[in-house]
A protein has these predicted regions:
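Beta-strand/loop nucleic-acid-binding surfaces
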Residues: 33-55, 91-101
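Solvent-exposed strand-loop boundary residues in beta-sheet-rich modules
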Residues: 30-34, 85-87
Length: 102
């Protein structure tokens, strides 16, 4: 749809490992209510300095490419995005448009 990257809102739920930078777990709920889990370096999710002593959950985001936008039959605005791969092996998601920012 466009070449600019957008951001998808996620919840950073826990600190996983004290590497440099640290590794955290983040969760994304898609438009159908399915929760997807991501595990990666802190800077991919937030500019905050997070560690094992930080409070969780915290707001975060992931860069994503917007593939398409539409409204479903109920008038709900949806967006298909591509981002890093979840631990379930999925990298394309349909989310609510309110979860995506430019």
């Amino acid at each position: 749809m466009n070449d600019r990257l957008s951001k998808i809102a996620i919840q950073i739920t826990s600190f996983v490992a004290p590497h440099n930078p640290g590794i955290v777990e983040g969760k994304l709920q898609d438009a159908e209510g399915v929760v997807h889990t991501f595990v990666d370096k802190v800077p991919l999710f937030t500019s905050e300095m997070l560690d094992a002593h930080s409070q969780y959950p915290q707001d975060g985001n992931l860069e994503c490419a917007v593939l398409s936008r539409w409204q479903d039959i109920d008038g709900q605005s949806l967006v298909q995005i591509r981002t890093i791969e979840s631990i379930e092996g999925i990298s394309e998601f349909v989310v609510l448009s309110s979860q995506v920012s430019d």
